[in-house]
Amino acid sequence: VRTVCLALPTNRECADTVTAVGAEAAHAARRFGVRVHLLVLDSADPAARARHAAAAAALPPVEGVVVHHLDEDAQRAFLRGAIERSGLPGPDRLLDLMLPDAVSYGACTNRAFLLAAALGCTSVHRRDSDSRYQWHDGAPVFPIEHELATIGLKAADAAAAVTEHTLDPAHADKPVALVGASFIGELSVDLGEIRELDPETYHDVVALWAPTGATEEERRELVAESFTGAGTEPFTADRAVLDRPDIWRIDMCNIALDHEVYERVPLPPATDTIGSDYFLHHLVHDATLPGVTHNRHIVNYYTPERRTGSGFTAYQERYAKFLLSMLYLHPVYADMERAGGALLDEHHHVRPEAIADSARRSAATDRAENHRRLAELDRCYRRLGGKYAEFADHLAPARARLLDEAQADIEDFALLIDAWGPLVRASRATPADRLPR
């Protein structure tokens, strides 16, 4: 029986999402005959955790579905064991990269990857706490329908399960490494208010994540494509395309990854940085691995804490760090694009050493572009006034720290890639009595 992991990392109250994802797990087990480990990785406050535990306990028992609700203590205990078994140097440093004190979108997904390895899963299917399913003909529109139909299959064999097949026949023997769709509803990054207040400033703020040297036309295209997902058009009928994955149309709240990818290269463990969990999108695409892009989009909505007070400040700082991370990630993306299929070995497996080397090289990139990004962000936010000008006041004394953190983040990524193979093997070797309950 194929074993898969349906993962829901959360740091906020989302009991309704736990219930909804539980229904998707039950659907997967019944429809595909798979064993589903439903993994709720919970970093929320104690009151929210208690509600999540109650929601998980209230899920109707379904044959083939195993529910794990793990707080940070349980996650830490698992990680300590895996790190210890790996024999890697610097165990405390590795634990910090895997479970930092701060928010890390990459690290929470990396924990799901290692737990999935421990539980014998062949794929990870990730959902998010601030999303819900569309409904059509009285039933929820579950993305796992497309994910389990194709993930991990040889592309030639997956062709029968999609509505369109445009993959170059040269890639027919490679496995489907990624299956995903996007979201409908609000922007995936909480900048919608800026877009409404001042579209010109919105353009300037979003264009800051363009690569160094991008033309004005390239920047305009980037702004038009960024953070909008699949717009607002609701689901009416299935469409699934087998090709290189359309990474602009796949969101981390709606994705399945094959273990042959995530067991070789982790996500960047950057803290307080939005978008740090999209690296494997680029890797799969650039390495010429097949993917399926479908249209079972999830509904994205916002929790109000991002828009006022300390929640607003924290979120805008994560956006600033996202912009700074691009100084180091764009050169890695460029290296991967140039390498193409050379990123794979003869078994169509990704070569992690090439990625680690590229990340290490990019850490030495001149910071001038990031100084410019921060100055431009300051100008834009002061132009908006109000709480945005107040955020600019908050950002000014933090500049040196943020610049240092962005460089340290890419260095940490290289270090984690080096450690990843031993960590995955150590996770697979977790004794039965130490597996997550």
Predicted regions and their residues:
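Cell-envelope/extracellular polymer assembly enzymes that use nucleotide-activated donors
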Residues: 3-5, 37, 279
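Short beta-strand-to-loop acidic/aromatic patch adjacent to the donor-nucleotide binding site
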Residues: 97, 121-138
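Catalytic beta-strand/loop signature of glycosyltransferases that borders the donor
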Residues: 127-128, 291-299
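Conserved catalytic core of nucleotide-sugar-dependent glycosyltransferases
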Residues: 133-258, 263
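A short, conserved alpha-helix in the catalytic core of glycosyltransferases
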Residues: 255, 261, 272-289
